Amino acid sequence: MYIGRIVAFGMTKDGRPCAMYRVSSRSFPNRRAVENQGKIAIVPREGAEGDLAKNPYISYNCLRIAGEWAIATNGSQTDPITEKIAMGMPVRDAITLSLLALDYEKDSLDTPRVVAVVGRESKKGFLGIVRKDAVLVREFDLVPGQARYISTYECNSPADEYVDNDFDAACENCAVQYVVNGGVFANIENPVTSAAAIATDDGFALGTLIC
């Protein structure tokens, strides 16, 4: 099954919140997640820089931290959402305003923008999407051993059924692996790269994986 880019949040079985992002792509598979100065960006792999001329949407910050919140998205919405949350705006409003302002991507597929935000202290998670036909944002309570997700295609609403009830990750490297081939994600096709932030005692630890 191919469902495009995936954002997810969850809580490990020992109670640590986690945000995850996975690039699944048919058209532009030559990408990688790179950590730099406390954030993670999606960039072309060496030798594939020319892909940016074909599609400007394929490179962006995909994961950032704002205080107690970890923000994962599939596009340039990462930055305004993070900045609004850092300025004190409620998470729901920061997601909604940023998605409305940027709208869906104006590529050949009208690709939706998706967002997952998780709180280290609040024990809350949010999923959001802007599609050509809708803007949807929803808040969830975190549950140990559970991850929720939304994707650009197919699983493209913050619905109860898009859930993994056996989620666990011992560390950030385990989280990036899980969103590629763990639980419900194992049967999703065309993994390219992934990123994750998992809560620690004093913040979040970041991890990346190239498939």
Identify the meaning behind each predicted range.
Residues 1-211:
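Conserved short alpha-helical segments that host acidic/polar catalytic motifs at enzyme active sites
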